[in-house]
Amino acid sequence: MQRLKKLAGVLAMVFVVSFLFSGCADASIAERRQDTSSTLYTGYVGTSFPTSFMPWLSRDGIAPTVASMIYNTLFSYDTDSGTYAPLTAKSWCYVDLEGQPLTQDQTFQTANDNEAVENYYSTRKEDYMAVRIELYDNVYWSDGEKLTVEDVYYSFDLATDYALSNHAGALAWTADLKHESDGRKLVTQGMFTAKHPDLSGTYGILPGEEDTVMYFLVNKSFGAVTTLFNTILILPEHIWEPIVSSECQLNSKNPQGELLKRYENPVGSGAWILEKDETNTQVITLVQNPNYHLKAQDGSALYKVDKIKILLYLDSNTAIFALRKGYIDILDSAVSSNYLNLLSGEKDIFVSNAPGNGISCLVFNVNPSKPYDSGMKMLLQDIEVRKAIALAVHQEELIANVLDGAGKTASAGLISANDELLYEPQADILSGPVEERLIEANAILDERFPDKDESGYRLYNGERIHFQIVTAAANQDLVSYLQRQLQKIGIEVTLQAAGSTPETTYLYNSNFDMTVQSVILSMANADVMYKAHFVTTERSSNYGKIQNEELTDEINAMRKTLNQEARIAKIHHLQVLTAQQYYKIPLYSSNVLSVARTDRFTGYVVSDGQTVFNNETLKNLVQVTGE
């Protein structure tokens, strides 16, 4: 109780001192209290808001959230059913090389028959499969132009054309698409529409389908469609095609003229439209798109608020105090577990304690590249050293003290035990009594580094073995407890502040010893993320640049198999292989804690891995009327 009183006092003091320096200093802090409209006041904690909204520009901060509200992908992924849910496109299916559907009833409108797909394509010498998609016929851009398959073709073609896009990430998104352009010149055609036809006539577009039907050729992998379907935001061709060139690339750090105008005035097909006149560096305002094609079951608007105002706060304390005082309705930022007990008992406060879908890992730099291939980090190339450090990590202690219990332990295979289909118990090699693990860890290190200094830390060439963990300052508690745990095996670690661009500054170029990374592996993303985490070494999630032939071969085999049972079996085996590398060491799977007020809106939905500011919440909100 004393701790809660102190925390509440700190919040009050911080709010009084810092509100004038927050992102909302020039806005009326009482606006929300007096507003009776269907406007959702949303707080966000960050250092700044973007001033431009090119959808592929950034994955940092609020930018991807706003982009995904203004623009749409082809589909969204439904984790409950394990299927792609309609969004811009209403249906898809695999077809054979004559264009005939490989579905359960041999029509274009039913689910894929995976056995038929396997039987057909396993016998073909071609290195690709064909996919048919069909768009909704009533999708419009926010400027009134109709969205057609030509917009999809343009977006994906641009993503393969680095000379025009200047976007390395887009090349990764389209890596499984058998299509390529270079400087607006077609190199390989792997997409077909009415205006970009298949000259062989195999993938023909029938009369009436010109705007809605197209075909892709993709690598022989069930995961090949993943990033095409739910990662690439579709761009309006009529907006970007006249502007983008090799001299005026889509992804620009210094946009000028017409390009800057388009960055600042996005034209999207999503459920929300940017209200430019009410948007600045401190507030982002989105209004509901009245012509959005997806509706609720009763025919009403899919989302239940008319406007969303996102307000910037520079720190969590100020944002939480603003929520408690009624200046905002909801936070689109996870809050520390320190606030859980404080907020749970407050009137008109809804606390979302959602299970996380990511596993926080301690990642080792196992294969540093020049010029950073020196120093203590080179010791991490020894798999036994990595194993010793992994054995010393005490997840239960971290969960109890860093997360205040709001989390769960994770397997070294990096897939949750709750995933009944994929979880492999034999990969859980870092569980068991911590005392026994410490004995084993010290035995390993005693053989390699028997000498210690006066503080009990191990020595290498006369110097204390010390590693820096590149991570956000918010992880100070985590690093402090890791210091205590690794001290028990004579290893010293300290925090190195990650800054605002850790990937560019440290991680991509090997300028680090260890880092903290969230890993999410699932049936939906296995093809993409196993490769990103454990194979690709350039600008990928494989920060430590691990290269293991057996692991790489098994990942490639998993990606290429068209038999679902064999694919699942290989994912089980991959968990064992990745665990045995002692490369990404599980720390915990933390819950996502977030908060909202219930005096203006109710109907908040707790969604795994997300804050309470999520799509399902926006679909279910009910405005409170009366006193």
Give names to the regions the model predicted.
Residues D78-D80, N230-L302, K307, L438-I439, ...:
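Gly/Pro-rich hinge or "lid" segments in bacterial periplasmic/extracellular proteins
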Residues W92-W173, M378-Q381, R386-A388:
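Aromatic- and charge-enriched surface segment that lines or borders ligand/interaction sites
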Residues V283, S360, A390-A427, A474-Q483, ...:
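Detector for C-terminal structural segments
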